[in-house]
Amino acid sequence: MILRGHHGAARDSSAAGPVWVTKVDPGDGATGVFRDTPVLARLSHPADAASVHTGSFRVEECGGAEVPGVVLLSPDGRLLIWTATRLLAPGVEHLVTADGLKDHRGRQVVPHRSRFMPCALARDDLPG
């Protein structure tokens, strides 16, 4: 369903249809990412909290080693927040995978993969 308002057409995210990851930060192909940066994923529909865990939303180093971390869900159910429990490896490509998530209606979220590369710095390394 398309809604029309003062600012043009917009998608009605409550309508039936596919459920997908609309945005990930750091973005696909990002470089120079701080080693302590959380990974954020915005969903088109609220997630079923029971489907949100480190098996369904994870970060791995190139080569397949999973990075230990925790994943939280925002109160509105649309934002996944993954935080590493150690600093990310600098200069190593990291793969973000969302696979096995469901929305609050039980519909499968379309699997997502993206990549980013941390630099040698963490935010705490910066002065000030």
Named regions from a protein language model:
Residues 3-8, 13-128:
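Acidic, low-complexity Ser/Thr/Gly/Pro-rich repeat segments typical of extracellular/periplasmic
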